[in-house]
Amino acid sequence: MNLTATWNADYIDAQYERWKSAPDGLSQDWRYFFEGFELAVSDKSTAEKTIDKDWLERQARVQALIYRYRDLGHLLACLDPLAACPIDHPLLNPSAFNLTSEDLDLEFVAPRFSKSGRAPLRTIIQALKETYAHSIGVEFMHLQDPDERNWLLDRMEPGRNKSKFDHTVKRRILDNLFEAALFEQFINKKYIAVTRFSLEGGDAIIPALNGLVEHVAQKGCGEIILGMAHRGRLNVQAHLLKRPYEDIFSEFESCYDPDDLSGSGDVKYHNGFLTDLQLTQSSSLRIFLINNPSHLEAVDPVVEGFVRARQDIQSDQKHSKVLPLLIHGDAAFAGQGIVTETLNMSQLEGYRTGGTIHLVINNQIGYTTLPEDARSTRYSTDVAKMLMVPIFHVHGEDPEALVHVFQLAADYRWKFGKDVVIDVVCYRRYGHNEGDEPYFTQPLMYEQIRQRPSLHQMYAEKLLEEQIIQKDIIDDLEKTINSRLNAAYDAVHGSECPFPFALFYENWEDIEADYSPAPIDTGVKEKTLISLARKLNKVPETFTLNPKLERLLQRRLQAVESGYGIDWAGAEALSFASVLTEGAPIRLSGQDSGRGTFSQRHSVLVDTQSGKSYTPLNELAENQAPFRVYNSLLSEA
């Protein structure tokens, strides 16, 4: 059915009358629509100011076309480096809206696409393609909050969803791409067939991540907690966290035995790293890459918990000081249940962190499994739609688009405190790892990849054409990077047996495997316990307690005062109270944590008249530590 089939002049007349009497009662699109109509007839005399129903119907069709591009423009976007760009889509063709070539030069209302508020249809369509069907495809019309949608529209449409980067930024992107590519090529030559899970094919994430760091630092962010799997992990360590090449190369040397290190034994592409980046003389930012197992996405809730703990410690109620950043693979993001569970936690009171930036390195394959065998959805990121958050699909060989999207994503996260997903459509230059042969299962795909030039070469050609750099700059850049790589390799390879970086950080750096603490006395004086019990087992006079709970609290108090009949839940409450009054905070989380699964805890009491809650463990002393208890999502699988 044609979208405009239900549009008619009577309906438009009715909406127009509503707009004249109460404009705020209509959506922003309708307000723009009729404001544009008034603008269109403003140069006519009063007698001529009547509704041109033919023009209004055409305008309605144009408005429907604009809406369709906002909703489905991503279907026409050029996203896949290994496929030709789509030329047309039947749902986005003007003919689907009864618009013809005769309408192309007629002016219509399009406030965000023109400073005057009006533009020819030809110009509007071109603007829509540049905004929604170029290197970036956006899914955001599923968002139910009109403020979020309008904020995104205001950020994307006037500038065609792109940033005008100066020469300095473009040169920085070039440097990052060369560093990322030459690093992988160097290791491939020096450590032939050694597993490293190369980033090649997804190189554009390096300048994008570096751009994100600089952008969020300006917003007052002091820490990024990063979780990612093995793909590109060493490259990210080297070129985002600035881990020395010597440290990385030492793990490739055959004399290095990770079992010699207490608490280690893991492979090189699982290890974490902590760094403090000095961005300017007055600005620094800490990045902590969390250690990760081979179990894909297992790190996701660990990162979120780490971030929430850091935010609680810093009393960061606005969630602006610590940012969670998760890097996923496309197959794992769609396939692993832990991803969905972690997403579901994002807006829950006990778990929210103010929004996570999710980067999906979409190399369009999972080991040897193609997307059609790995998921039941068009995009690997479709599961994130349940959160009503924007999803940006980006061509993996357009680094400027990716840098732009990361900044837009960060701004959205800081504005609305919600997750945002960036799907980078790229490829992997080798098999699942460097010892894998992809030609066994995807010969056509990998022949195409084999013939494809590296991104750093293509971007260098682009900057040469734009006359931003000269050939000698490229040559010098390549020599400088290779010189650094060779110097680091010589330093490591020439030593008797290099010792790698420290595996423990700050609070953990003095931990020793054979350390055993002496027994300590954890007891509390009887009079202290009785005093705590009296506070735990009473409620304010104005609080109406359930009669059954009133009797339960009385029994608990009597048990403590008599020293006989203390049950498990009562003992737990006393132990919690003693710890809290000594200044140590307590957090309980899990389904039914407040009441207790077997109706035993009752740490949160509910007034039977008002429904308000009261937590005795938070009413023990003025200077006590906080007791936080959160019921959780159901997670039993």
Label for each model-derived stretch:
Residues 1-37:
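Subset of Sec-pathway N-terminal targeting signals
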Residues 57-67, 74-109, 123, 147, ...:
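Flexible, glycine-rich loop/tail regions that form catalytic "lids" or insertion modules at the edges
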Residues 281, 286, 379-405, 447, ...:
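Conserved thiamine diphosphate
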Residues 182, 186-246, 551, 557-558, ...:
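Active-site pocket-lining segments that scaffold enzyme catalytic pockets across diverse folds
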Residues 366-377, 385-421, 425-431, 439:
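Conserved phosphate-handling catalytic cores of large alpha/beta enzymes
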Residues 222-388, 392, 598-637:
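Cofactor-binding active-site loop characterized by glycine-rich and histidine/acidic residues
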Residues 37-205, 221, 529:
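Extended, charge-enriched "interface" segments that sit outside catalytic cores
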